[in-house]
């Protein structure tokens, strides 16, 4: 009888260890799936989205959100630039079928004036003063965007290579791989950056 209890006790220990190992395996597989298909860690390079995102900040890109709902104006998105295969974080200004223009620093969509509430007003004034320019965003007019095209622009207009540049142009929907980013480093500035409208 005593021998049977010891054998059962050993089996209980083995089953407990196996359950623990199974839990670890499931956790590792789930983490790999999340990191490959749902989220991705990146570091902000450059100042094209300053002050919204700052150079050197570490972010988690939310690729899953890309498959839920439509891309909206002023969403912050991550897009793959075809020429370099680099990932660019930009803001959606123009949607398919629209004509976008900036005149005297003001955004117009299909001829209608549209406010850009996400722009940091103090930074805009600082840049205009430093560069001795009247407008934060220089004049620009797009062709009518195609049915699958988006005009992506950096928040730091004078420092951003984006859709306004003829060499870049509009981005296709298939190039947009994620919507929204979560800044996690430095921890003191942790925040979600998504829709600015």
Where are these regions (language model features)?
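Aromatic-capped interface at the extracytoplasmic side
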Residues: 33-49
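Short, functional N-terminal and low-complexity linear motifs
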Residues: 20-26, 42-46, 144-147
